[in-house]
């Protein structure tokens, strides 16, 4: 059997152009949402202005925080909390309940079964197909699967990655991914997820996990993370931009899958016996 490679004309240029345009628009709307958030919080001065790389603290402050490492007390963190103090805020424990998943260990990994999602599979834009699986006989999917509107938040490795689950998922997540179930109605889910991925929370994660050889963000520290509560209309404006971004990204994926199927069908036709 002989195989001939598909010619270039099999690739629909209009489809490719449309795909690229949608990705660009998706990125634009997401960045617009980020810009709106930072504009509301920082105005025109959201980039830190301090040039000092040290601060002076009383020992009582160090004793209270339980941290003696100098990195924890950098002026940029003081500047962040000073800015947040100008807004109504809540800690994560006052916004969402936190549920831990499981960490079965590599010895439990299989080539088939229940998909096992790890931190490396998650970005703020979605979850890629896992290449590791767990036995359905050893783990309860019903208890551990991410449910619709749950926010996944990474606490180990690449800490502080947040993703809002769009629909119930047929998978189990790593213990390094916390499940946040929001109960505080003062926050829209898309707004909260954006804040978790923003510099506002990333700096708090950096502050808490500084000095560790392997980054680890303790759930007790995550509970105390400060979230600014912007007025609901502003949250809804930000959420609309996020939703538009994700809708465009989903449509671009559909187009890409369609293009792949077209090429695969043409390749099959070009097999010559």
Task: Give residue spans per PLM region.
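A short glycine-rich beta-alpha junction/loop motif
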Residues: 1-12, 171-178, 211-234
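Short coil/turn segments at secondary-structure boundaries
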Residues: 49-52, 104-113, 207-209
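A structural connector/turn signal
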Residues: 140-141, 167, 212
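Glycine- and charge-enriched low-complexity intrinsically disordered segments
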Residues: 189-202, 207
